[in-house]
């Protein structure tokens, strides 16, 4: 008798994705972040739905409605801070997930990797429009500064900015449309996640050794469901610790002041997870150049499969590239720190050095290291 989960069409899809899925037997905890991102997305959609029930997307009442959620709605403060800190957890998992993909050479699964880049950009767009919604000082000025970057596009730039604003400045029309975008984008992300998984299950997962694992596969359930469950509990513990003890540690104090177009904050900066890209943007004195560098800082991920010339998948047996990888990680930490600092000496020069080294490591040094490692391997073959 065939198992019930192999008969019904919908159950068969679930079965082949999460139960009987053949999985490499040696994947480490670095492979947990995919499922954690799924949990983060679910938390964000659920908390966001409950917030949307009480939020009003009008410049006159947006700030007050967020205050009302925190003060008057049952557990509104909990939902609001789960949503705000859930976004931070989302990006922590996202950075670790991408970092693992680079370290273990998962970018060689081209379709999965490219859909992943589209997902990354969509999540960044969602987080940006979401940050505008509380209509605090940093929300307003962040929206003004970032949308204004589009004016650097030759010829159509200024018209495009006014079209996005829905007027001649960030105002009621902007807030309403940003709320609409923020509501719809998570569902687009969910659809993209399904496509991401579809392409992943076409090829099967990569593994730490970088070797073909077809001869050594185990079913996803119960082995990896239990393993993922442990990751979920750790994620929820960290998230609840943040929410209950330090809910505002990752936020900006300026956002507790209602938006005022007549008063500019001393230092306009985005949320911490955008600071690395913001630092790259600020390190170039030219406006259009800065915008291009900002876009390239993310799109450069698409160059990894093209620049890869190594005979091995992953960095496990590649000591030179490993050193470069950790240089890149340290570089991103420095960029994140610089993005939050004022535009003055010595921060500007540090930001410029870090920006140049970010692109140099990926485009010049890593391919050179791969060539050296290939030649060393030839000697010892």
Swiss-Prot record:
UniProt membrane topology term: Multi-pass membrane protein
Function: Component of the ubiquinol-cytochrome c reductase complex (complex III or cytochrome b-c1 complex) that is part of the mitochondrial respiratory chain. The b-c1 complex mediates electron transfer from ubiquinol to cytochrome c. Contributes to the generation of a proton gradient across the mitochondrial membrane that is then used for ATP synthesis.
Subunit structure: The cytochrome bc1 complex contains 11 subunits: 3 respiratory subunits (MT-CYB, CYC1 and UQCRFS1), 2 core proteins (UQCRC1 and UQCRC2) and 6 low-molecular weight proteins (UQCRH/QCR6, UQCRB/QCR7, UQCRQ/QCR8, UQCR10/QCR9, UQCR11/QCR10 and a cleavage product of UQCRFS1). This cytochrome bc1 complex then forms a dimer.
Highest taxon in the source lineage: Eukaryota
Single Gene Ontology BP annotation: mitochondrial electron transport, ubiquinol to cytochrome c
Lineage: Eukaryota, Metazoa, Chordata, Craniata, Vertebrata
Family that this chain belongs to: Belongs to the cytochrome b family.
CDD domains, alphabetized: cytochrome_b_C (cd00290), Cytochrome_b_N (cd00284)
Organism: Sigmodon hispidus
SUPFAM superfamilies: a domain/subunit of cytochrome bc1 complex (Ubiquinol-cytochrome c reductase), Transmembrane di-heme cytochromes
Residue intervals passing through the bilayer: 33-53, 77-98, 113-133, 178-198, 226-246, 288-308, 320-340, 347-367
Name of protein: Cytochrome b
Tagged with keyword Plastid: no
Residues binding heme b b566, per UniProt: 97, 196
Pfam families: Cytochrom_B_C (PF00032), Cytochrome_B (PF00033)
Cofactor(s) listed in the protein's UniProt record: heme b
Record GO terms (molecular function): metal ion binding; ubiquinol-cytochrome-c reductase activity
Keywords: Electron transport, Heme, Iron, Membrane, Metal-binding, Mitochondrion, Mitochondrion inner membrane, Respiratory chain, Transmembrane, Transmembrane helix, Transport, Ubiquinone
Additional free-text comment from the UniProt record: Heme 1 (or BL or b562) is low-potential and absorbs at about 562 nm, and heme 2 (or BH or b566) is high-potential and absorbs at about 566 nm.
Localization of this protein: Mitochondrion inner membrane
């Amino acid at each position: 008798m065939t198992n019930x989960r192999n008969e019904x069409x919908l159950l068969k899809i679930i079965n082949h994705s999460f139960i009987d899925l053949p999985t490499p037997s040696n994947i480490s905890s670095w492979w947990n972040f995919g499922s954690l991102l799924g949990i983060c997305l679910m938390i964000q959609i659920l908390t966001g739905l409950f917030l949307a029930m009480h939020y009003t997307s009008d410049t006159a009442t947006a700030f007050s409605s967020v205050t009302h959620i925190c003060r008057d709605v049952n557990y509104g403060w909990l939902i609001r801070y789960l949503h705000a800190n859930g976004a931070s957890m989302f990006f922590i998992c996202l950075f670790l997930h991408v970092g693992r993909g680079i370290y273990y050479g998962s970018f060689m699964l081209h379709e999965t990797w490219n859909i992943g880049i589209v997902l990354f950009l969509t999540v960044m767009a969602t987080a940006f429009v979401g940050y505008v919604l509380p209509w605090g000082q940093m929300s307003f000025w962040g929206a003004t500064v970032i949308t204004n970057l589009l004016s650097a596009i030759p010829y159509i730039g200024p018209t495009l900015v006014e079209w996005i604003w829905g007027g001649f400045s960030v105002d009621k029309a902007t807030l309403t449309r940003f709320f609409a975008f923020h509501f719809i984008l998570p569902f687009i992300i969910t659809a993209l996640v399904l496509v991401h998984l579809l392409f992943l299950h076409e090829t099967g997962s990569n593994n730490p050794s970088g070797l073909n694992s077809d001869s050594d596969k185990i079913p996803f359930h119960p082995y990896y469901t239990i393993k993922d469950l442990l990751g979920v509990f750790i994620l929820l513990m960290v998230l609840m610790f943040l929410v209950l003890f330090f809910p505002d540690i990752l936020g900006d104090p300026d956002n507790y002041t209602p938006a005022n177009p007549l008063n500019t904050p001393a230092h306009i900066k985005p949320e911490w997870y955008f600071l690395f890209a913001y630092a790259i943007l600020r390190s170039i004195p030219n406006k259009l150049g800065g915008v291009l560098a900002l876009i390239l800082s993310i799109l450069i991920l698409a160059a990894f499969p093209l620049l890869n010339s190594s005979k091995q998948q992953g960095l496990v047996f590649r000591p030179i590239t490993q050193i470069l990888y950790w240089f890149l990680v340290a570089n991103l930490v420095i960029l994140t720190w610089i993005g939050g600092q004022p535009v003055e000496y010595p921060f500007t020069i540090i930001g410029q050095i870090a920006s140049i080294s970010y692109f140099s490591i990926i485009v010049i040094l890593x391919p050179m290291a791969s060539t050296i490692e290939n030649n060393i391997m030839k000697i010892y073959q």
